[in-house]
From Swiss-Prot:
The keyword ATP-binding does not apply. It comes from Shewanella baltica (strain OS195). Coiled coil: none annotated. One of its GO terms (molecular function) is ribosomal small subunit binding. This is Ribosome-binding factor A. Belongs to the RbfA family. Keywords: Cytoplasm, Ribosome biogenesis.
């Protein structure tokens, strides 16, 4: 019995977190006119069990850490206003207090993907450069093996 109540509670917080993520994304794209924030992506929302706090994980497509910190500070200062806008769109008795946290995982993932792509391209270039030399060496070695095989079959007849 207790387990079912806890499972329902967690699924409710998960549903609220998903809806909060969608509403925050819309509010930040359409309703926020602060030029300091710019383009922001809401990656995830983690709501506390009692629904009093929500950690909002965001990403900015900026490499400069100072610019990222400025944008994050602008979001943090606008959090009460954003909370009011989102509260008008959601039917909750208590709207969680928003805590914005910069999530570098997306930027880090893109950086890692670019590094992997660079290594793959370098390997392809090396294969093309050395591939023709290796192919001619393999032909010479295989040619000798074929000649040896021919000599062996002639001796058996």
């Amino acid at each position: 019995m207790v387990r079912n109540i806890m499972a329902k509670e967690f699924s409710r917080t998960r549903r609220i977190a998903q809806q909060l993520q969608q509403e925050l994304a819309q509010v930040l794209q359409r309703d926020m006119k602060d030029p300091r924030i710019g383009f922001v992506t809401v990656n995830d929302v983690d709501v506390s069990r009692d629904l009093s706090y929500a950690k909002v994980f965001v990403t900015f497509f900026e490499e400069d850490k100072a610019v990222v910190q400025e944008k994050l500070n602008a979001l943090i200062s606008a959090a009460p206003y954003i909370r009011t806008l989102v509260a008008g769109r959601m039917k909750l008795r208590v709207m969680p207090e928003l805590r914005f946290i910069y999530d570098s995982s997306l930027v880090e993932g893109m950086r890692m993907s670019n590094l992997v792509s660079q290594v793959i391209n370098q390997d392809k270039a090396k294969q093309q450069q050395f591939g023709s030399e290796e192919a001619s060496v393999e032909d010479e070695v295989l040619g000798d093996d074929v000649a040896d095989d021919a000599d062996e079959t002639e001796g058996k007849d």
